[in-house]
Structures are given as structure tokens and as C-alpha cells.
Design a protein with these regions (language model features):
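ATP-binding N-terminal substructure of ATP-dependent carboxylate-amine bond-forming enzymes
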Residues: 1-99, 105-106, 111-112, 116, ...
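Active-site nucleotide/adenylate-binding loops and adjacent lid/helix of ATP-dependent enzymes
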Residues: 4-10, 64-65, 109-185
């Protein structure tokens, strides 16, 4: 395979060093994924540059225009400190006509809403556990057709954020407390 210029995008605090010497295992763990991806791409013969994304896209714009990468390897999970803005980075890559790895903007937006994602799965015949959304300000009661234990999580938090042992509830009081806790976040 012909070597490519690969631009690796990540959070600005996770840009890995060239070498791990001098770092503690705890420090390395913070940027382990980013380091491993960059090292593997280099070992495969590709030219690699890392961009740490922070609050603006000016450095990304400059590198795309001057270096002209073939593809962006997207490890960015947030933009401007917010996980619900990662789709904007991907939209920008599309506007710049730069191919990228990972999900497209529409997929990122849809996957962020767990309720909508579940509805789409059910609509398309994919078996999924029953679920219920408790709107803020409404009475919290056991939904019809569901029984304990239940797993309670935010409809919008990214990945497993907010999930804890208390997310598994065994009675109505635990359910009410956990839903109220999530609504207060």
C-alpha cells in the first residue's frame, strides 16, 4: 500500500509525545490510545501529523491547506469542551473535502439521542430491550410493561457517562431517586 499523509485529530490534552520515556504509567494511560494509533500508522509507513483540537479550527484549517493530508483519522470526542459538538468537527472535514474515519455528522447526532436511537432500531426490526423516557417535571412511576430490576441512564450523556452501580434499580423508590438524580445533572 502506498504511504499516505494521515492527520490524526484528538483532544488538545491528549496529543502524545514521540517517546514514552520519562512518563509514569498513569500519565501514559491518559494518551495511550492516541499514542498507539499514531505509532501504528507510522510503523505502517504513513506520514502522520497530530492536531490537538481545542476551541477553534484555525490550526486544523491551516494544516489541511498547507500539508494536504489524504485522510483524517478522527479520535476527537468533543469540541470546545463539549461532547455534543463533535459532529461539527466532522462537518468541517466534509466542507474541506477531507475524507475521515468514523461516523458522519448525521450519525453522530442521531447516536447522541439514546431514545431516538432505540426507536430507530425497533422500527428497523432490531431487537432491543424495552425502554421508557421520564420527562422532567412529570411523576415518576413504573412504566407499563416494564418490571424491576431496571437500568436507568441519561438519554443524552455520551457513552457510559453517568452510569454507576446506582443505575440498576430494584424498586420504585430507587427508580425515583435515580431519575431525579439524572434530571438534576
Amino acid at each position: 500500500m502506498k504511504p499516505s499523509r494521515i492527520l490524526v485529530l484528538m483532544h488538545e490534552t491528549l496529543v502524545p509525545p514521540e517517546r514514552l520515556a520519562g512518563f509514569t504509567s498513569q500519565q501514559i494511560e491518559e494518551f495511550r490510545t492516541e499514542y498507539d494509533v499514531v505509532q501504528q500508522l507510522k510503523a505502517s509507513g504513513h506520514e502522520v501529523r497530530c492536531i490537538g483540537l481545542g476551541d477553534n479550527l484555525s490550526e486544523l484549517t491551516d494544516v489541511i491547506k498547507s500539508w494536504r493530508p489524504h485522510i483524517a483519522f478522527n479520535l476527537a470526542e468533543e469540541f470546545q469542551g463539549l461532547v455534543n459538538r463533535d459532529q461539527h468537527v466532522v462537518s468541517f472535514l466534509e466542507l474541506m473535502k477531507l475524507p475521515y474515519t468514523g461516523c458522519n455528522p448525521k450519525g453522530l447526532v442521531l447516536s447522541r439521542d439514546k431514545s431516538l436511537s432505540k426507536q430507530l432500531l425497533v422500527f428497523n426490526g432490531v431487537q432491543t430491550p424495552k425502554f421508557f423516557v421520564f420527562p422532567k417535571g412529570r411523576r415518576i412511576a413504573l412504566p407499563e410493561g416494564l418490571g424491576f430490576p431496571l437500568f436507568v441512564k441519561s438519554v443524552s450523556d455520551d457513552a457510559s457517562f453517568g452510569i454507576a452501580q446506582a443505575s440498576v434499580v430494584h424498586d420504585l423508590i430507587q427508580l425515583q431517586r435515580r431519575v431525579e438524580f439524572i434530571h438534576a445533572q
